[in-house]
Amino acid sequence: MEYKDVVMPEPLDDGKKKKKKEILNTRISPVDFENISDVGDLVESFQSASIQARNLGQCAKIFGTMLQDEEKPTIILGLAGPLIAAGLRKVIRDMVHYNMVDVIVSTGAILFQDYYNALGGGHYYGSPNADDTQLRELFINRIYDTYVDDELFVDDDTLVGKFADTLEPGNYSSRDFISRLSETIDDEESILVTARKNNVPVFCPAINDSSLGIGLTQHYYQARKAGRTPITIDSIRDNYELTQLVVQSTRTAAFYVAGGVPKNYINDSVVMAYIFGKDTGGHKYALQVTTDSPHWGGLSGSTLAEAQSWGKINKEATHSMAFIEPSVSLPLIYGYAFQKGLYKGRPRLDVEWEGDTLKKITRRRPA
């Protein structure tokens, strides 16, 4: 007997035929390089492919929709992972320069390594199989297959502390401190410098867990030793400031690169809106590129649908996740938006602070 005689002895009835036709509706389109001329075309073609290529294509499509939405949602970019070591400094800087993001929430390591590069430091080819004890003897730090100069790291830690020494004692948000720190460097390729020049707030909610925090700890120690009052980075002021941005925005959209503290912090700013008497309804758009998995239960890999149960992402939001390492996925999504020109004509967010109070948030057309 043939397979069909055993497994499919009876033909499908009309109802099942109709349902089958509904399900087998859209064909997968092969990636066709005869019709692909650039990264933008490649990523667009992924939208008709499968597996993580389709997820990446959907993330890129959502990012483009964010940029062109008539409501002009405030786009908050969350940054975690070894992005500078991976060679993405220029990509992130250009996302700011070309007005693809309005607010940044980052780990301290990313911001410090931008600062380190601005002061002449670099990242170098290495090997994950290196003799790490020898590297330690040479004061070379390893980030998987990439090396940095520990002597320069220590020098730059110290510079952060000495800069803090120049500030008036008091409470500073990470946004305020980072903006001031960026004034001490002059590098057009710097994320920090480009953000300051374009009035893009940069928050670092876990600043203590980084080389920036090491430098600030040195400042704290030296000030206490000398009987002076040190500055304090006020993490609750960070909450207060970021939540004002969320509350005063028409809508918000989130782009999470990896996960970690920045992802949850961006989401918690939506929850904290109730303190200001407002229910924002959650982010209108959300996308994430990550290698973390949902089934471990951790925040970094939790699905964006799960965030809807918390009200952090709108119940009708357009969202997608691509489980692809960010050193590959972020430049592809950026390249899609850049080469398609999806950022052009988008009014830049203009914010004005008075201490910890957001006095103005408007949009201005690009010159």
Q: How would you label these PLM feature ranges?
A:
Residues 2-3, 7-9, 17-24, 251, ...:
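C-terminal functional extensions of proteins
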Residues 60-74, 194-196, 244-251:
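Glycine-rich phosphate/diphosphate-binding loops that line cofactor/substrate pockets in enzymes
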Residues 75-84, 104, 203-207, 227-299:
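Glycine-rich anion-binding loop/nest that anchors nucleotide
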Residues 92-158:
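A generic, well-ordered mixed alpha/beta core segment in the N-terminal half of proteins
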